[in-house]
């Protein structure tokens, strides 16, 4: 066992004959020296200076409580060494004054000590004694466990008792240990003086504490005594709970994920929820008792409605402040059907106008489409038409739709249903209507017989309207140069007399029918074709049609009118003149400096024609543009060994930058650290943005970052926190920035990465501090969103507004990289087309990894326009000295090099429509190896590098479009099958395009498939799928190769017009897959005919998808990026484009669309 060192404090109280009292203290407690004053005074008075002679002391004894412990006797023995005696080895008499030394002392040594002195009888005081008290002090024992006297929610009064023995007194002080039981943290506080009570304050509410006491004296401290545990009173939480996520689970229910307040001040007992629709006046109250970590489910909500949600946490002692959120419930299938269907047959046409009222006032669903089902009385299958409506458009009180191409004079049953984005609601009751007979048709002349005098017998044929039950009336007009005769008849023949010989007559017949809807209305048809005849003598005549056996000569029409020929000649001459002017202007523009055009910022250019960048950075290697492609390949060798080495050097050179501050750095203060989204990511002091804040706190987690040739070209910052929204917009206003680049999603992997600092709805401004932000417009495609925001000072007079562009790229994962560089490059080029008025603000979540990658790539892009050398590593080192950890991972560092490499190799592939023909001409030029740039583009992006070559084995491939990442699906089913309709139902496909439909495609499947759950109903151009009470109407569009060859874009436009939901649902293209064959990459055709080029319908389908995507991009942005589409398709399926000709046809079709011809 280790030695225990006791510290003894020794008090000596002397008492001798002269009544003198002396006290002696030994602080180290290793020994006690007890003086004998009578002996000392005697020796000093009567003996020589050496205190040894003459020997006048005859005897001296030391007693402890009357027990002899040490003695000196002068004449007891002849042996002088035996004249000294002690009872214990710890005792020792010290000459010359006979001081008693006790070493070491123990608590048993305490008591009354007495020295007795015997001297020579010649002296006046032959005997003298002195007494003293020796007290040995030890560390005290621990006090008892404290008792609770009074308490509150944040303080407690303790009292205790302490039985101290004589060896323990005096007690100098008591100390109290306060331990938090939950995390075992503790602190010690001293009681005032040596009182046995103390008030412990500054405690946390509703917290279990353990209290114990120790005593302290001059010898030391006791151990802490037994603990007393006690829980303080609770109080209402002082912070609101946090709403982590809200999710629509149905149209009437939401799921809210809540975390309790950070300082609960008690056990969570329940959540109090207040929810109120925006158009309601009284909120609905809900209580969730004993909540757990599982989300709360709130139901009985109205679909497609904005709700205000407030949640309070209750711990039994009170409620917390409210956590508030505004959310929008999901739309639902309408639970109502259109009522009061009115059908109005159209007079004179086999058409019916259908009228129905708007949804009920209590209906909250946003109707996007109405479906009209109709069928004739004798038909079995329903036909369907659709009326698209805008949910955000002008609210109409009455809807109208006209059914056309109906059978005349036929009774129809009509139903109407409404659809939201979630599906179709119930159908209305049948409404019955009868169509009119329709416009009368025309007659066809049968024969004309001459009576050899002055009359003719005319006969004709007429096919009456279907279901027409009334006899028509025929009006026959006979005219010559001087007279006009008109005859009415209900017969199919007419005798005409009193005609002149040798006059040319013209015959025309019109049909009249009475409307079956309105008996007072006469329907007038169109005149028949004109026929001429001339009567002559001897029973002969000329006619435009002759009856057999008659003396009739065929009457031919006269030559064309010279006036019309003159007009045609003039029109032809104008066309020739316009064509010559176009050719002159075209070649005149071609002589302009192409490179000068490419340098215009507002145009999309192809970069390889320009000299790229150099960045002069000491100690780093400058790479010529011509060698950069091979330089990156070299870095990639041996599992990217050189990349790893470079990145390690970069990390070592910038490893200490993240801790840079000067003196008392603002970023290190408690107030500023609360403004950081992540504890380890702050703003470097030297380059941070300093806000002009009236509060005096100028900190925001943002830094200036230079481009290669411009200081403070960018601002890299974190995603703003709700508490820093006002600081963020203050920075935008202060720095006059009008471009915000956001490269993160709101939530990633279930974690909040960014809080929404802009309004969700247009014309619904939100105020952040002193600034008001309004969403002006928002456009979204498959990769990013472009929002235009209106920023102004909220209460400024007069109001000053600024337009701010927010570009939100959504395809970059946190700590990762996109699968392809081309969507990012296209996004960078799109952003660069916007004129900036200040630094470009870039943020992801922390503002270092993805933000740094974007800034690095865009900085290289800017300088590649003017320089032909670049230094990526050197510039990134410079950037990291301005904001720590930019380009955070090795994977991002490699990705930036790959993006710059592809930028150099393929240039700016997002080409403006004005420059597309020149760009196409540029691709057709050959290099020194005899290959065109288009061929190199195909080999680099599309060509399959694997052996054997990759083949498409899946029955269906999902491809991205301009609007969605799953906009197209290409299936290779050669026949109708259950898998086809199962996919259609699961993906909610509403339009199917069949390429080159074969007669054997439709197999007439049974009416029930998919385990009997889905019912099929085939129509003329649609298939109706039904499951329970849900229906899905799928329009079938047939497209042939011949039609595509004749007019490609007319067929594409026709497909787009017939899409039921346009881009809201995938477009499924069915193409027959033929046995695989790999065309030679050098095969070529001068006409690029679709029939010759594509020996497989699936390849044609892929090109249709790509062309449609590019057409949408051209229509929306005025630019085309073919490379981005090719790379995204190849990323999904290697070898999807088998030859250069397949991408050449895409360029060919895009050139037609922008108004050019093939170069």
From Swiss-Prot:
Membrane spanning residue stretches: 565-585
Stretch list, region Disordered: 656-677
E.C. designation(s): 3.1.3.48
Record carries keyword Membrane: yes
Disulfide bonds: 36-115
Major localisation: membrane
Reaction it catalyzes: O-phospho-L-tyrosyl-[protein] + H2O = L-tyrosyl-[protein] + phosphate
Record bears the keyword Repeat: yes
MF terms (GO), sorted A to Z: protein tyrosine phosphatase activity
Signal peptide range in chain numbering: 1-21
Boundaries of every Ig-like C2-type domain copy: 22-135
CDD domains, sorted: FN3, Ig
Keywords, in A-Z order: Disulfide bond, Glycoprotein, Hydrolase, Membrane, Protein phosphatase, Repeat, Signal, Transmembrane, Transmembrane helix
Protein topology in the membrane: Single-pass membrane protein
Sugar-modified residues: 28, 153, 194, 248, 279, 362, 480, 488, 519
Residues in compartment: Cytoplasmic: 586-1159
Low complexity composition-biased segments: 658-671
Active site positions, chain numbering: 844
Every Tyrosine-protein phosphatase domain range: 643-903, 888-1153
Gene Ontology BP, a term: neuron projection development
Residue stretches making up the Fibronectin type-III domain: 142-235, 240-335, 337-438, 439-538
PANTHER family (alphabetical): RECEPTOR-TYPE TYROSINE-PROTEIN PHOSPHATASE, TYROSINE-PROTEIN PHOSPHATASE 99A
Name by which UniProt lists this protein: Tyrosine-protein phosphatase 4
Gene (UniProt): ptrg-1
């Amino acid at each position: 066992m280790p030695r225990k060192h006791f510290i003894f404090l020794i008090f000596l109280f002397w008492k001798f004959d002269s009544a003198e009292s002396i006290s002696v203290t030994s602080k180290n407690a290793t020994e006690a020296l007890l003086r004998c004053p009578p002996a000392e005074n005697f020796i000093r008075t009567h003996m020589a200076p050496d205190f040894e002679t003459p020997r006048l002391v005859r005897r001296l004894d030391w007693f402890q409580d009357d027990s002899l412990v040490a003695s000196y006797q002068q004449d007891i023995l002849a042996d002088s060494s035996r004249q000294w005696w002690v009872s214990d080895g710890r005792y020792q008499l010290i000459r010359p004054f006979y001081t008693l030394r006790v070493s070491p002392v123990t608590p048993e040594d305490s008591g009354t000590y007495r020295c007795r002195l015997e001297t020579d009888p010649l002296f006046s005081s032959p005997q003298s004694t002195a007494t003293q008290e020796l007290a040995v002090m030890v560390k005290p024992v621990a006090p008892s466990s404290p008792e609770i006297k009074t308490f509150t929610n944040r303080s407690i009064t303790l009292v205790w008792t302490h039985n101290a023995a004589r060896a323990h007194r005096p007690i100098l002080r008591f100390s109290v240990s306060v331990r938090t039981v939950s995390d075992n943290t503790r602190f010690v506080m001293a009681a005032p003086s040596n009182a046995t009570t103390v008030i412990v304050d500054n405690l946390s509410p509703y917290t279990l504490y353990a209290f114990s006491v120790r005593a302290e004296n001059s010898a030391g401290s006791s151990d802490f005594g037994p603990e007393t545990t006690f829980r303080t009173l609770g109080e209402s939480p002082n912070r609101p709970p946090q709403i982590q996520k809200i999710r629509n689970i149905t149209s009437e229910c939401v799921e809210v994920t809540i975390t309790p307040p950070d300082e609960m001040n008690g056990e969570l007992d329940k959540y109090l929820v207040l929810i109120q629709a925006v158009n309601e006046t009284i909120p609905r109250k809900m209580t969730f008792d004993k909540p757990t970590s599982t989300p709360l489910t709130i139901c009985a909500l109205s679909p497609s409605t904005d709700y205000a949600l407030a949640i309070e946490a209750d711990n039994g002692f009170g409620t917390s402040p409210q956590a508030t959120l505004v959310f929008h419930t999901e739309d639902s299938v309408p639970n109502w059907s259109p009522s009061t269907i009115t059908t109005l047959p159209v007079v004179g046409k086999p058409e019916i106008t259908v009228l129905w009222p708007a949804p009920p006032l209590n209906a909250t669903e946003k109707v996007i489409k109405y479906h009209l089902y109709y069928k004739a009385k004798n038909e079995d299958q329903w036909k369907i038409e659709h009326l698209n409506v805008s949910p955000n458009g002008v609210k109409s009180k009455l809807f109208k739709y006209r059914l056309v191409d109906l059978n005349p004079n036929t009774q129809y049953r009509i139903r109407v249903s409404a659809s939201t984005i979630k599906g179709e609601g119930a159908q209305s009751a049948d409404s019955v209507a009868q169509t009119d007979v329709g416009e009368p048709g025309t007659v066809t002349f049968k024969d004309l017989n001459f009576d050899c005098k002055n009359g003719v017998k005319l006969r004709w044929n007429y096919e009456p309207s279907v279901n027409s039950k009334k006899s028509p009336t025929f009006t026959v007009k006979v005219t010559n140069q001087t007279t006009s005769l008109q005859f009415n008849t209900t017969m199919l023949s007419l005798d005409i007399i009193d005609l002149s010989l040798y006059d040319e007559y013209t015959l025309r017949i019109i049909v009249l029918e009475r409307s079956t809807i309105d008996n007072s209305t006469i329907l007038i048809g169109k005149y028949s074709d004109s026929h001429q005849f001339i009567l002559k003598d001897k029973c002969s005549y000329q006619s435009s049609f002759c009856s057999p056996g008659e003396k009739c000569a065929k009457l031919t029409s006269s030559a064309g009118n010279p006036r019309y020929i003159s007009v045609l000649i003039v029109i032809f001459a104008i066309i020739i003149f316009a064509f010559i002017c176009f050719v002159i202007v075209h070649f005149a523009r071609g002589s302009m400096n192409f490179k000068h055009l490419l340098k215009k910022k507002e145009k999309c250019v192809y970069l390889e024609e320009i000299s790229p960048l150099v960045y002069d950075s000491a100690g780093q290697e400058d790479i010529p543009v011509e060698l950069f492609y091979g330089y990156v390949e070299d870095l990639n060798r041996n599992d990217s060994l050189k990349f790893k080495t470079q990145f390690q050097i970069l990390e070592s050179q910038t490893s200490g930058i993240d801790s840079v501050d000067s003196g008392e750095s603002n970023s290190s203060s408690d107030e500023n650290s609360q403004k950081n989204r992540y504890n380890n990511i702050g703003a470097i002091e030297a380059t941070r943005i300093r806000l002009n804040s009236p509060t005096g706190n100028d900190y925001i987690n943002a830094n200036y970052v230079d481009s290669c040739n411009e200081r403070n070209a960018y601002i890299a910052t974190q995603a703003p926190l709700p508490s820093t929204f006002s600081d963020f917009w203050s920075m935008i206003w202060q720095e006059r920035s009008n471009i915000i680049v956001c490269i993160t999603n709101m939530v990633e992997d279930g974690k909040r990465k960014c809080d929404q600092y802009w309004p969700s709805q247009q014309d619904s401004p939100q105020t952040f501090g002193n600034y008001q932000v309004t969403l002006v417009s928002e456009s979204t495609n498959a990769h990013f969103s472009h929002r235009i925001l209106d920023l102004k000072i909220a209460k400024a007079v007069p109001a000053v507004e600024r337009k701010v562009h927010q570009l939100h790229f959504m395809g970059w994962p946190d700590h990762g990289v996109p699968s392809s560089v081309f969507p990012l490059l296209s996004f960078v080029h799109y952003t660069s087309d916007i004129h900036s008025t200040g630094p470009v603000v870039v943020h992801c979540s922390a503002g270092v990894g993805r933000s740094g990658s974007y800034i690095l790539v865009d900085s290289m892009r800017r300088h590649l326009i003017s320089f032909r050398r670049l230094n990526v590593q050197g510039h990134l080192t410079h950037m990291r000295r301005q904001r720590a950890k930019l380009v955070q991972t090795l994977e991002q560092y490699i990705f930036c090099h790959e993006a710059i490499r592809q930028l150099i190799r393929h240039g700016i592939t997002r080409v403006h429509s004005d420059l597309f023909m020149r760009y196409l001409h540029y691709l057709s030029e050959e290099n020194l190896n005899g290959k065109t740039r288009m061929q190199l583009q195909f080999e680099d992006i599309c060509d399959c590098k694997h052996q054997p070559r990759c083949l498409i084995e899946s029955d269906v491939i999902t491809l991205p479009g301009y609007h969605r990442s799953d906009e197209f699906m290409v299936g290779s089913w050669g026949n109708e099958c259950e898998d086809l309709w199962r996919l259609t139902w699961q993906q909610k496909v509403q339009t199917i395009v069949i390429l080159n439909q074969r007669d054997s495609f439709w197999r007439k499947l049974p009416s029930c498939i998919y385990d009997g759950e889905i019912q099929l109903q085939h129509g003329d151009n649609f298939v109706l799928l039904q499951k329970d009470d849900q229906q899905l109407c799928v329009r079938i569009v047939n497209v042939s190769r011949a039609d595509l060859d004749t007019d490609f874009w007319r067929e594409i436009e026709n497909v787009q017009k017939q899409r039921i939901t346009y881009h809201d649902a995938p477009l499924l293209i069915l193409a027959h897959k033929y046995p695989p064959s790999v065309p030679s990459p050098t095969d070529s055709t001068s006409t690029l005919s679709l029939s010759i080029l594509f020996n497989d319908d699936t390849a044609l389908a892929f090109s249709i998808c790509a062309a449609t995507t590019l057409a949408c991009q051209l229509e929306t942005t005025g630019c085309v990026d073919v490379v981005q589409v090719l790379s995204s398709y190849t990323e999904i399926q290697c070898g999807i484009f088998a030859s250069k000709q397949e991408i050449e046809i895409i360029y060919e079709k895009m050139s037609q669309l922008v108004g050019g011809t093939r170069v």
